[in-house]
Amino acid sequence: MKLSKKSIQKAKIELVDFSNCELSTKSYEESSMKKNAIIFKDEKYLLKYMEKNKARHYQDIKNQKETYFNSVYSEYISCHIGKMIGLDIQDTIIGFEKENNKLKRIQYIPCVACKDFCKSGENIVNFERIFEIVNRKENQKYNDENFNDVLKVIEKQEFIDKNNLKENFLNMFVFDSFIGNFDRNLKNFGIIENEKDKTYRIAPIFDCASSLHPKANRKRIKFLANSYERDSQSVYEYALSPNSYFKDDNGTKINYFDFLVNNSFNYNSDIAKSIVKIVPKLIELNNNGGIYDIVDKLDGMIIPERIEVIIKELNLKVDEMFIPTLEISKELLNKEIDEFMLKDYSGFNEYNKEEKSEFLSQIKNILEIQELLVENNSNNFSTRELYRRVDNFLENKNTKDMKAVFVYLEKNDFPIDYIEHFEEKFRLEIEKSTKNKEKSNNSKEINEDEEIGKEKKFDINF
């Protein structure tokens, strides 16, 4: 749908005119959209817009009539949905640029401005580069299109805490399955490097333009809108057809619906955690009209049928894909806790350093799972019951020094609710100890008690 001065004036949101923005010297990766580095309100932005010639250049190989002309809107809608469910995702602004055509008439070119999330002295390191580094170090050749190989490289890399990076990647994967992103290649996610002190952080999610069927032309969209009216089977097939960029171990592209529902995501508890974390927020946003509000604001920029198709498709995905996979995930995570409650840890002191570290990571993971389940009213075990089990383990490791345990929990980022629980136990223990001291007339005994916490350490021997 062509923009005009009239449609811009009637738009439901303010469309920013980027025509006279100062250009920045920052350079970005080439993609299917024309890009310009600009300065807007003293901030760096990447301006992405689809020129007609550019759109033709990136035509679909199988269907020469399909282009990525609607990627501007896909980027804006997807990023705003991600922002509303609390994901760390790039900020975007929708707008236009003016230019004169051959007849010297003003054309209004739709564009989306993506805020640069790198601070001064920082640089984006995409995952393609991380793959190269790990391959060279390990003398391996991990497949950059294989989903499981990506997870292996996440485990092997040493820039970011592997658990945090894995969680971020899987959260992004679940989100991509909702927006139907078919091009989350290794250049489209990564980490940020501070070039001065060589510290690293995970980059926000960016480049969501290959989502929400950006290649579907007006004719296709109108056909789908009519199909929704008729409740046609073709609607279900089209809505659930998007594949991930990544492939399974057989070299087949992962279909999001098959992977999450039919194959139950291979009962991977890490994926289940991301599902329980992301999906309830998507369901709530869909049910309270939040998605409709985001898409409807583009009325006048995109045809009404496209608005209708996007809203109905995402609603269908909630019902057909996400509600079923959420139930599978809850069941799997409750089973994880059930197995932990029955676990025998009597041989912990005979574990080697790696085994001890792994078991304590399991405890942390179980506590995180419980938090997620409680948030969604889906926990089979009470939190008090689980905490009692964890307490029994932590307090029986050849030490009575709760202070040392407390320091360990904080240092290793255990869930805050459990840390506060343990801190309260620590406080009550101090009160009890103080009362006992007051009753005692043995000053030597008092002095010995006061040294507790200063000399003993949590007996894990890392």
Go through each PLM region and give its residues.
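Conserved kinase catalytic-core segment
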Residues: 75, 147-217
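C-terminal catalytic region of ATP-dependent kinase domains
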Residues: 83, 195-347
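Juxta-kinase regulatory segment immediately upstream of eukaryotic protein kinase catalytic domains
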Residues: 2-11
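Repeat-associated, polar segments at repeat-unit boundaries in modular proteins
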Residues: 355-370, 407-433
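Short amphipathic alpha-helical heptad-repeat segments
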Residues: 333-337, 359-365, 382-386, 394-402
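Conserved ATP-binding subdomain of kinase catalytic cores across diverse folds
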Residues: 10-134
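Charged, low-complexity interaction regions
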Residues: 345-353, 374-383, 394-401, 413-418
